[in-house]
Amino acid sequence: MANDVTKDPTPKSDIVEDIYLWRRKKLAFSTLLVSTSTWILLSFYGFTTITIVSWIGIAVVSMIFLWGSLLRLLSKVEPELSGLEVSEEFVVETVRSCRMLMEEMVRWMFRVGAESEWFVFARTVLGFWILSRIGNLLDFHTCLFIGLVMGLTVPKLWEEYGDQIQKHLGSLKDKSKGAYNTTHEKILEMKNKLHHGTEEKVKKSE
């Protein structure tokens, strides 16, 4: 009697997550090595992002042209391009994902601007300001390289030391809130004193 029970295939782990968390050390190290070498070469020769993209486009179009020409010369058959069509489901899913991302960004901006506390707002503005300064000092491929290096280091550090980081951040948040409350109370006291002093001067003048 044949066994009808089939085992479910084991789910495949996410390759990107494995690289960021260094579960596949060889692949993560290879990614870091290739990106570092590419960044050094680009910085050494002074290439810009537009130049690199243009050269990649030239190479891709040239290879496709040679491939199509060889197919026509050898087999006299036109290249099969039906597999290059973009399905409607893919387009709909891509549009839905982009819309959800934009809606989430808009909601996040309104939460930070209208609903969050002052230190969240200040931290967000400071982050955007630092990002703008980095953008003025660095070119595009350097920013991409820094982002990749941070992506390969920050998640791993957060996985190992996330609890300690959250503990210190919570302590810093409480201290900042206490300092803000103290400063706010002192400012209110000074305003009240100035207001009472002004009223007394007005009464004396009358």
Swiss-Prot record:
Alphabetized PANTHER family for the sequence: RETICULON, RETICULON-LIKE PROTEIN B13
Gene Ontology biological process terms in this record: endoplasmic reticulum tubular network organization; response to bacterium
Name of the protein in its database record: Reticulon-like protein B13
Keywords noted in UniProt: Endoplasmic reticulum, Membrane, Transmembrane, Transmembrane helix
PROSITE patterns on file: RETICULON
Residues covered by the Reticulon domain: 16-206
Compartments where located: Endoplasmic reticulum membrane
Encoding gene per record: RTNLB13
InterPro entries: Reticulon (IPR003388), Reticulon-like (IPR045064)
Coiled coil (UniProt feature): none
Biological source species: Arabidopsis thaliana
